[in-house]
Amino acid sequence: MSTIVRQVTVQGRVQGVGYRAFVEYQAMKLDLEGWVRNRRDGSVEALFAGPAEAVAEIIARCRRGPSSARVTKLDEQPGSVDALDLRRPGERFSTLPTL
């Protein structure tokens, strides 16, 4: 099974509503590697690495988000394996500081 890496940027009401915690929880349930962080422009950015089916599923879940969020736009692009190095040592999935 090959690993794919995707980076997403999510816009809408996605900060201050538990969106990052939702993404981290969903990613861990799907056994994905990566990270999630807020951006100063009000969006949320995430990187996911894992089997194609699981990555597609997490992106679908990101489009929905938690009930308190309202996603208006999700941009997806290929990600870099090197970007996984941003995770905290020893963690498969990390919530990173705001960028």
From Swiss-Prot:
- TM region positions: none
Top-rank lineage group of the source organism:
Bacteria
Reactions the enzyme catalyzes: an acyl phosphate + H2O = a carboxylate + phosphate + H(+)
InterPro entries (alphabetical)? Acylphosphatase, Acylphosphatase-like_dom, Acylphosphatase-like_dom_sf, Acylphosphatase_CS
Q: Which residues form the active site?
A: R20, N38
User: Which controlled-vocabulary keywords does the entry list?
Assistant: Hydrolase
The answer to whether the entry has keyword NADP is no
MF-aspect GO terms? acylphosphatase activity
Q: Tell me the Pfam families matching this sequence.
A: Acylphosphatase
Which Gene3D superfamilies does this entry report, sorted A to Z?
3.30.70.100
Q: Where is the Acylphosphatase-like domain?
A: 5-97
Task: Quote the EC number.
Answer: 3.6.1.7
Q: Which family does it belong to?
A: Belongs to the acylphosphatase family.
The protein in question is named: Acylphosphatase
Q: Which gene encodes it?
A: acyP
